């Protein structure tokens, strides 16, 4: 039984170090050597639990996406329409990526690496029927998953492309919502209302509050403290 507890303790220590380093200095800049040194574990112990650094990221990814649409519901109301909940949630994600380069790196990797992408697509696809069934009543789980495959690709592209004077955040959100909501057969007048509502929000302040809550939740879940807080 001691061996099981020891393995659990090593896993927890690795996760604590990795999540902190990913958020403080970025995923790519966090080397396996640094992880081993700070977690005080051997290479064999690490790879016995996590076959690769990306496997650690899958645990972080699952935590980040397990409460999708919770923040959006708190902002626009739990009784808001499905398209508005979707619009607010995706706008928050896009804004988070724009405000924090470490989060952008994590999000883009999550939407790129096959195993991580599959995890996110399946989690998001499970939410889509309750959001868009009224617009696509004939669609089942397979069809909604197929739509998520496409819209997640759109999300990745907009996250990876940084805003500029020529392409400000408001324009990015508008373009993304037009393309994604049309995919779900939402009427144009309703799409326009969703975009107007999202753009009327102080989305940067909201994203900052969400980021602070996310970081606090990660600190509690993985037992670490971020530097420079």
Regions found by a protein language model. Give the residues of each.
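Generic hydrophobic, amphipathic alpha-helix propensity
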Residues: 10-18, 35, 60-64, 68, ...
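The short coil/loop that forms the "turn" connecting the two helices of the helix-turn-helix
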Residues: 9-10, 41
């Amino acid at each position: 039984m001691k061996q099981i507890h020891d393995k659990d303790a090593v896993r927890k220590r690795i996760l604590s170090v990795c999540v902190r380093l990913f958020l403080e200095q970025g995923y790519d800049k966090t080397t396996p050597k640094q992880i081993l040194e700070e977690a005080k574990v051997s290479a064999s112990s690490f790879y016995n639990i996590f076959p690769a650094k990306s496997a650690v990221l899958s645990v972080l990814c699952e935590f980040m996406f397990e409460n999708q649409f919770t923040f959006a519901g708190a902002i626009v109301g739990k009784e808001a329409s499905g398209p508005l909940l979707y619009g607010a949630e995706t706008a928050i994600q896009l804004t988070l990526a724009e405000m924090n380069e470490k989060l952008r790196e994590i999000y883009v990797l999550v939407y790129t690496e096959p195993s991580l992408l599959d995890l996110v697509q399946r989690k998001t696809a499970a939410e889509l029927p309750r959001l868009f069934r009224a617009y696509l009543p004939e669609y089942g789980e397979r069809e909604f998953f197929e739509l998520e495959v496409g819209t997640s690709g759109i999300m990745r592209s907009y996250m990876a492309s940084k805003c500029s004077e020529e392409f400000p955040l408001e324009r990015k959100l508008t373009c993304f919502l037009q393309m994604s909501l049309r995919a779900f057969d939402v009427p144009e007048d309703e799409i326009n209302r969703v975009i107007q509502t999202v753009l009327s929000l102080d989305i940067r302040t909201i994203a900052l509050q969400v980021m602070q809550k996310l970081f606090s939740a990660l600190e509690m879940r993985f037992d670490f403290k971020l530097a420079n807080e």
